[in-house]
Amino acid sequence: MLLQVDRLITELKLPPNDAYFKLRHTLEAINDLISSCSTTVGGTQLVDPVAGNVCFASGAAGWSFTLQSFAHLYLKIHGIQFDHEKFASRLWGDLYFHPDSRTFKKKPPKEGANRSFVEFILEPLYKIYSLVVGEQKGNVESKLAELGVTLSNAAYKLNVRPLLRLACRSIFGTATGFTDMLVKHIPSVKDAAARKIDHIYTGPQDSSIVDAMKKCDPNGPLMVNVTKLYPKSDCSVFDAFGRVYSGTIQTGQTVRVLGEGYSPDDEEDMTVKEVTKLWVYQARYRVAISKAPAGSWVLIEGVDASIMKTATICPMNIDEDVYIFRPLRFNTLPVVKIAAEPLNPSELPKMVEGLRKISKSYPLAITKVEESGEHTILGTGELYLDSIMKDLRELYSEVEVKVCMMHFTTLSLFFWVN
């Protein structure tokens, strides 16, 4: 999703043609990054507006569209009987509309002609913004009427920002384009399970556990991959966020929590916990549930005590060996190190407890004690460490903490030199 497209109009004030080149350059940069980071697992899926996996949006103005949804809207407004998918395929790239023959060609009809994306999408969008910002009620009212939108007289008395948001939402409607993009390009949980399990499960692939996970079987053995810990409002304990790959997790259920160091030969990194509560996230809200079947993302209370980064949850009794889901992998390393100590030495235990919570909350943070007794924190960069220190001071330890000089680790210098 390309957000803040409206800033090309309101802040950068780019001409429509330049805005098109900016958007195209951004997508090319994204595809270059995808290609450079891609693995053999699942192949490489590049973003392309014609394919329908790019959504243009503005959070401030409350609109979003794909080429397909915009083409459908355009044909509906103008009463044209034509396949919107075919029309959408002609709205990107070096294609030009020839009004005489009413066809799209790679050759422009005249010198200086605009590409189809500029002519059919950007220019109307620019016109809407210029009319609303111009604060000429008559012009806005007549133009919106052409688009089949009627606003109340009270709406035209609003300030520019709320009026623009109301006008754009009335024109573009609900986020059907974004929803259609998700439905079309994101596979269902069951369809994606086999590829996912091959990639993240560390055990043998011919076991009955793997078979149940690949089928997303709600009646199979419980297997949950915990990937993130979220603090409670008082930051005293955490709730575990994970995906149920097989089985059904329920409140009151006793489970085994396997840490990142667990293996069937070494069961030291394992604890037994009871699931006390379950929720599903809906934006910033939590909805309490009693159970969650395979395929669900669920928030779990009561199992966080032994989890540091990620974990695997499995049932108490199972006939075969259970292996863990592999820990998360990142393209960056925590190479920037700072030393921290409490301003008041007597508050050291509080800071140490806060550092433990920081390690649980930040996936790429590493906290350790040096041989000198110094407490150090490693992060990916200055901004990352700033966020860590803010949370350490205000949420997790609630003590004054002073920081020694920041420096890069030997590992980072090695990468720079080479």
Task: Give the residues covered by each predicted segment.
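Structural and coupling elements of P-loop NTPases
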Residues: 1-418
